[in-house]
């Protein structure tokens, strides 16, 4: 006989789908008057949304239909897509508690890595953010900057050994992925994944690196989980997924989840033991006890009461959340910078000159201090402009917890010809916020908004941009989101990028090869060397420069 739990899931799923279809086609929605692109009756706009080159479709939608657009998902379920600054402020800042990040009781990320900061809501999120804010402070970044330099020097040595005296085609994206994982490991967890002397064989590191590539093979998994998550408990959902024999990627995702949980638990226990032995024991660990998890654990152990502490489940979840949130986003941002520098050799040479001069001032063999590094104008301009035009995440999602009204900065023309100044959202409506679209809005940034021009950051920004009050946490940009749910580690990520560029550019030149590079849209944008390939890869011609 079939497993009773599967029968219950099938019945619940069928009933839920019937209700959705009934509700969609018999009840008129306030979103019906918004402009919208063509969609299919069953899948809606999902084929375009999950397509690997969907960034082209998003640009078309943004330019054609404006800053408030109706999209559809399965069975005509309606969604709002917006990149209007006032709407984003309302959703991310003013009424953030009424727009939870989760679309259900849990989603596939919490199912596989636990209730970390990215996925916590309400009081749980506020408590976690309160504990984590101090460990991402500027003072903490100064403490770990030498760790970043140490990893960067190892990378420089490894690349020199590979290229020798001649230029070589190297998978730069692969090296950036290994390096950012090691930086996150040492400065974040006090753990080393990679010695750069050979291919990595660390099971924890391999699990972390595999998480997003595997989840990319099951793009509809999150929709399946979200559809049923409000109706069945987490333990039952995991049991159902274990029975997904025809879907090997789902089973692999479960194994990856188990490896991450097991290794995180072991690392946490080792750190707790070292903390109990005192500072001398911490000094001998990777990160010397100044890594983020050691600082967090120490603060947590010294909390005034047990009720104020983070429980072990949440501490474990922070580890995988921290790595997964920072690894591909930072490594692919670095890859994008190096790709753009290879396309613009004049910019590369100008930046190399600034970085070489900064290193000469502090003296050979010494690190450029944190406070000097973050003030280098052209380095900052290159990083800002790349993150403006190519944010690692193109979109973020929210859900209306109740009937809401979203104001717009400027009206859009409705399908009935009237001007729409605000959008009424029925409860449970899913909202997609266009981060890249806001960053490249010509009304705010000018006609050259789609051009990569680092020099724009060396002069006053457009007055329209200042007046729009974009709610981003970083430089009038939405690249790291905004409000209390903005990226807590954006300065950490910037420091990683700037340290690596400071070491790599004076040491190597980067040129394009004969093969084109394709950038693909996924949970995080990633490069491939073939338009049909799913393997993250970016070949550049790398040549060692005279020391």
UniProtKB/Swiss-Prot annotation:
Q: Which UniProt keywords apply?
A: Heme, Iron, Membrane, Metal-binding, Monooxygenase, Oxidoreductase, Transmembrane, Transmembrane helix
What the record says about the induction of its expression is:
Expression is induced in ganoderic acid (GA) producing conditions.
Q: What is its EC number?
A: 1.-.-.-
Regions crossing the membrane? 2-22
**Per UniProt, where does heme bind?**
487
Question: InterPro entries, from UniProt?
Answer: Cyt_P450, Cyt_P450_CS, Cyt_P450_E_grp-I, Cyt_P450_sf, Cytochrome_P450_monoxygenase
Entry keyword annotation includes Iron: yes
UniProt cofactor(s): heme
Which pathway does this chain act in? Secondary metabolite biosynthesis; terpenoid biosynthesis
- Mutant phenotype after disruption: Leads to a significant decrease in the titer of the 4 ganoderic acids Mk, T, S and Me.
Annotated membrane topology is: Single-pass membrane protein
Provide the disulphide bond pattern.
none
- Report if keyword Membrane is assigned: yes
Which BP terms in the Gene Ontology apply to this protein? Answer: terpenoid biosynthetic process
Chief location:
membrane
Kindly give the PROSITE patterns that the UniProt entry links to this protein.
CYTOCHROME_P450
The record's family statement is:
Belongs to the cytochrome P450 family.
PANTHER family recorded = CYTOCHROME P450, CYTOCHROME P450 12A4, MITOCHONDRIAL-RELATED
Described function: Cytochrome P450 monooxygenase that is involved in the biosynthesis of ganoderic acids (GA), a group of highly oxygenated lanostane-type triterpenoids which well recognized as a main group of unique bioactive compounds in the medicinal mushroom Ganoderma lucidum.
Query: What is the protein name for this chain?
Result: Ganoderic acid synthetase CYP5150L8
Gene that produces this protein: CYP5150L8
């Amino acid at each position: 006989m079939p497993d009773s739990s599967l029968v219950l899931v099938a019945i619940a799923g069928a009933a839920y789908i019937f209700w959705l279809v009934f509700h969609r086609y018999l009840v008129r929605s306030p979103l019906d008057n918004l402009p919208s692109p063509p969609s299919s009756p069953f899948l809606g706009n999902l084929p375009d949304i999950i397509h690997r080159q969907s960034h082209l479709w998003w640009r078309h939608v943004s330019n054609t239909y404006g800053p408030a657009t109706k999209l559809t998902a399965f069975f005509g379920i309606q969604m709002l897509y917006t990149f209007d600054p006032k709407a984003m402020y309302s959703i991310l800042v003013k009424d953030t508690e009424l727009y939870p990040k989760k679309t259900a009781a849990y989603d596939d990320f919490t199912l596989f890595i636990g209730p970390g900061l990215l996925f916590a809501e309400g009081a749980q999120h506020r408590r976690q953010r309160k504990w984590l804010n101090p460990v991402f402070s500027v003072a903490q970044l100064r403490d770990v900057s030498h760790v970043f330099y140490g990893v960067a020097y190892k990378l420089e040595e490894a690349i020199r050994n590979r290229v020798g005296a001649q230029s070589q085609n190297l998978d730069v994206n692969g090296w950036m992925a290994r390096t950012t994982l090691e930086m996150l490991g040492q400065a974040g967890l006090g753990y080393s994944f990679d010695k750069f002397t050979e291919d990595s064989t660390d099971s924890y590191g391999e699990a972390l690196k595999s998480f997003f590539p595997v989840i990319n093979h099951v793009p509809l998994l999150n929709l399946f989980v979200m559809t049923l998550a409000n109706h069945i408990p987490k333990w039952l959902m995991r049991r159902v997924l274990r029975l997904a024999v025809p879907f090997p990627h789902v089973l692999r995702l479960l194994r990856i989840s188990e490896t991450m949980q097991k290794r995180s638990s072991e690392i946490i226990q080792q750190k707790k033991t070292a903390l109990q032995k005192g500072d001398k024991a911490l000094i001998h660990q990777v990160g010397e006890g100044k890594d983020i998890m050691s600082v967090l654990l120490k603060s947590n152990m010294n909390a005034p009461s047990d009720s104020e502490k983070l429980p072990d489940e949440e501490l474990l979840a922070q580890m995988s959340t921290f790595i997964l949130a920072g690894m591909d986003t930072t490594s692919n941002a670095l890859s994008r910078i190096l790709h753009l520098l290879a396309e613009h050799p004049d910019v590369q040479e100008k930046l190399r000159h600034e970085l070489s001069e900064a290193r000469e001032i502090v003296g050979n063999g010494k690190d450029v201090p944190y406070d000097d590094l973050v003030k280098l104008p052209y380095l900052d301009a290159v990083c800002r402009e790349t993150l403006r035009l190519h944010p690692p995440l193109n979109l973020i999602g929210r859900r209306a917890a109740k009937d809401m009204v979203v104001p717009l900065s400027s009206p859009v023309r409705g399908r009935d010809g009237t001007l729409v100044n605000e959008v009424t959202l029925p409860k449970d409506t899913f909202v997609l916020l266009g981060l890249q679209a806001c960053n490249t809005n010509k009304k705010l940034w000018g006609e050259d908004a789609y051009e990569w021009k680092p020099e724009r950051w060396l002069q006053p920004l457009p007055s329209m941009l200042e007046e729009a009050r974009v709610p981003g946490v970083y430089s009038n940009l939405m690249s790291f989101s905004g409000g209390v749910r903005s990226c807590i580690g954006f300065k950490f990520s910037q420091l990683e990028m700037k340290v690596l560029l400071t070491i790599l550019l004076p040491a190597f030149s980067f040129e394009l090869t004969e093969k084109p590079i394709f950038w693909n849209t996924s949970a995080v944008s990633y490069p491939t060397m073939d338009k049909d390939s799913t393997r993250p890869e970016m070949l550049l011609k790398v040549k060692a420069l005279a020391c």
